[in-house]
Amino acid sequence: MPIGVPKVPFRIPGEEDAVWVDVYRLHRERLLFLGQGVDSEISNQLIGLMVYLSLEDETRDLFLFINSPGGWVVPGVAIYDTMQFVPPDVHTICMGLAASMGSFLLVGGEITKRIAFPHARVMIHQPASSFYEAQTGEFVLEAEELLKLRETLTRVYVQRTGNPLWVVSEDMERDVFMSATEAQAHGIVDFVAVENTGDFA
């Protein structure tokens, strides 16, 4: 079992020598990252961090950076429910791609605190399943569960985007890709981040 907290070298601009920074510093700054497909493992990690950080200080907001191609519905819904449950507001920031379950988590951020980077992409669609692997009886049960999940996701999109049910239902029939400004117009994000044109040299 390792002793101590793992550290990584980091060189501050303008400094000659690198300093050793512990890898959990970003978490202490309340910065969380979803940079992969949603599965049970990353879901449990993010849920644990959100609960721990909210118990530590329920007044400081959390920031969830999303760059995800999507993933499993149930672990994603668990993250969404936790975001609604914890007392701190959860800012969601889309960088790169927030597709499928990634866009669901993006829209789940505190309303007025959902941001997309200027070149980010967002994609929504209905949940999918591997019907071809199931036997007939299982197929029917799985189809019923899939319809319930689709209804849940649709209801959340309607509530959090302000779009009518028919618009969201129609959009979820197929893959709908959006730019950051289109996602803002659609109500998935509240703001598009402004590019920093400052000179860092």
From Swiss-Prot:
Family classification:
Belongs to the peptidase S14 family.
Gene Ontology molecular-function annotations: ATP-dependent peptidase activity; ATPase binding; serine-type endopeptidase activity
Keyword Protease assigned: yes
**EC assignment:** 3.4.21.92
Q: Which organism is it from?
A: Ranunculus macranthus
Query: Catalytic residues?
Result: S100, H125
PROSITE patterns of this UniProt entry?
CLP_PROTEASE_HIS (PS00382), CLP_PROTEASE_SER (PS00381)
Enumerate the catalysed reactions. Hydrolysis of proteins to small peptides in the presence of ATP and magnesium. alpha-casein is the usual test substrate. In the absence of ATP, only oligopeptides shorter than five residues are hydrolyzed (such as succinyl-Leu-Tyr-|-NHMec, and Leu-Tyr-Leu-|-Tyr-Trp, in which cleavage of the -Tyr-|-Leu- and -Tyr-|-Trp bonds also occurs)
Question: How does it associate, per the subunit comment?
Answer: Component of the chloroplastic Clp protease core complex.
Matching entries from Pfam families are given as:
CLP_protease (PF00574)
Return the protein name.
Answer: ATP-dependent Clp protease proteolytic subunit
Gene encoding this chain? Answer: clpP
List GO terms (cellular component aspect). chloroplast stroma; endopeptidase Clp complex
Where is this protein localized, as stated in its record? Plastid, Chloroplast stroma
> What is the role of this chain?
Cleaves peptides in various proteins in a process that requires ATP hydrolysis. Has a chymotrypsin-like activity. Plays a major role in the degradation of misfolded proteins.
The EC category is hydrolase
Could you tell me the keywords of this UniProt record?
Chloroplast, Hydrolase, Plastid, Protease, Serine protease
